[in-house]
Amino acid sequence: MKHNKQQVLAFFALAVLGGLTVAACPVQAGGFMTPTANTAGWGRAFGGGSLFRNDPSAAFNNPAAMAFIDRPVSQFTLNYANIDIKYKGSAYDYAGNPASITVLDPDTGLPTSTPRTGDGGQGGFEAWAPTGFTVIPINERFAFGLSQVVPMGARTTWDEDWKGRDFAVDTKIETVGLTGSLSFKVNDEFSIGGGGILQHTTGFVSQNVDLYAAAAQSPDLGYTPFPAGQGLALMRVKVDNTSLGWFAGMAWKPTSRDTLGLNYH
């Protein structure tokens, strides 16, 4: 009976840890995310986050874990990204026809369409992303942290005359953040922490706009079926923003060898 209870408890513990592991996975939309873990995290597939002993990336990822760092520690990491993106597929205009170039015959006035066949070429990019972390214990209960991170970004460049030009041509989003954080050790098993981030974002998103196709959707023009692929204009939206954010976390050490963490950004 005792053996069966041990099996049940072991199964229950694994189920809880499995649930925590799933819940800890980051949720993100389209784009690219730069890992903000420490350099050693690459070697362990970022498992365990910033809960390992004397991990300075806790200054950003989970400030509560700084409370268990027993000495000043710093780290600088330079990440290099080489992303290949290629498109294979079809693209259609507003009328459901394959994306094409439309030219009006000067003699007859009738439109002549030539399908676009370009796949956009190499849409990927290369980038360097530096990160740095510093944690300084203040006393037995408090620790202070600083970090410089590149939380996310995006970069795609497609040929201007490719078949998907009405959806994307050139996109660039760059972010950089400076953070400060503080942790408090409640006892030898539990700690909490929080911090703030000053983040600067720059970039642009561009795509072509089919002016005649847009006009064809206007009720003021009686939904006149203008030919697609004729009136084109490049639209570019730029962003340049500096804003404040915050993050918080907690860490619990149920045993001397295990640590569970929860963080919010």
Feature annotation, model-predicted:
Residues 67, 136-137, 184-185, 248, ...:
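Residue-level signature of outer-membrane beta-barrel architecture
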Residues 81-85, 149-155, 199-203, 212, ...:
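Structural signature of outer-membrane beta-barrel domains
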